[in-house]
UniProtKB/Swiss-Prot annotation:
Keywords: Cell membrane, Lipid biosynthesis, Lipid metabolism, Membrane, Phospholipid biosynthesis, Phospholipid metabolism, Transferase, Transmembrane, Transmembrane helix. This is Glycerol-3-phosphate acyltransferase. The keyword Hydrolase does not apply. It is a multi-pass membrane protein. Its EC number is 2.3.1.275. Belongs to the PlsY family. It catalyses: an acyl phosphate + sn-glycerol 3-phosphate = a 1-acyl-sn-glycero-3-phosphate + phosphate.
Amino acid sequence: MKLLLFITIAYLLGSIPTGLWIGQYFYHINLREHGSGNTGTTNTFRILGVKAGTATLAIDMFKGTLSILLPIIFGMTSISSIAIGFFAVLGHTFPIFANFKGGKAVATSAGVLLGFAPLYLFFLASIFVLVLYLFSMISLASVVSAIVGVLSVLTFPAIHFLLPNYDYFLTFIVILLAFIIIIRHKDNISRIKHHTENLIPWGLNLSKQVPKK
């Protein structure tokens, strides 16, 4: 019964459409009608600015972190916290409060890893920043980080210093999270192949793609 309760709470937390609500209530802007149409962190930064984007990133990460801490807070250590966190990501991606049309799972997945293995998140975040600097594409950085995440958990225990609290669900959950992230970025991947993906004004842009005006 408690397991079902934790899953429900995690899903509902994840379902809070942070960027969408911030846009509607503070800026009177519907993110779905601007930019990529996505309600996640990247489009929030692009359309609403740094303050709204930062708030969206922080809250979306917090949803994942809080969800993974639920079993610990209530003393149910027999329940896999990483598995509970997965349902927050599921809620973020398919939110009941926003017609099941949500973000691309990156920020909330990061929040889940922050609560489970902060050093491991730092490792993947370093990969994210490196790829972002080299190619100036948030989408590419997200996809590459997801792939590296899968490869790294498959090499455990070689990276035990990054995952001291390894959970037997971790490999399975990370693969699921990576799958969701990659699938949610399928349109971005297509644009990357055709050199039409959105760029940020930072980094080397090694693909030499011409930024959109």
